Amino acid sequence: MTYTSFVNALSAIRVAGVKRQYTAPPSQLSSADLPAMHPQLPEHTQEVINLVSSPGMFAVVCELAIVIKANQQGTAAANFAECLTMLDALNNALIDNTSALNIDRWSMRQTAVEYGDTYWTIVARVEASE
C-alpha cells in the first residue's frame, strides 16, 4: 500500500447518490454535479518495531468529502435529510470496500466547506493499514 494507491482506491469507491467523483479537491463546483465526492488531507503513520529499523505496520488516513448542496439552496431541514441519506450511502460503500482497501475504521461528520460558496458537506475520516 502507498499513499497514492490508497487515496486513488478510496476515491474510486461507488457511493449511491454521488453524481461526480474527483481524484483531488476541486477548485470550484457546479450545482449540477452535486453531490460530488473528493479525497482530502491524507495522513500516514509508520512505526519502527526494533532498533534494526524494521518497518512496522503501514497506516494511512484519508478524508473523503461529499459535497451535498450550497447552504443557500433548499431548507435546512431538507439539506439535513440529504446529509443523513448520504451518511447511510457512504457508510454502506465503506462497509462494502472494507476488505479490499484494508480499512480499519472510519468516522463521519457533517460540516460546512467553502468552495467560493459554503456547502453542506459530509466528511469521512477513513483509516487503513497493512
Protein language model annotation of sequence segments:
Residues 1-31, 42-130:
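Charged, amphipathic alpha-helical segments and their flanking helix caps
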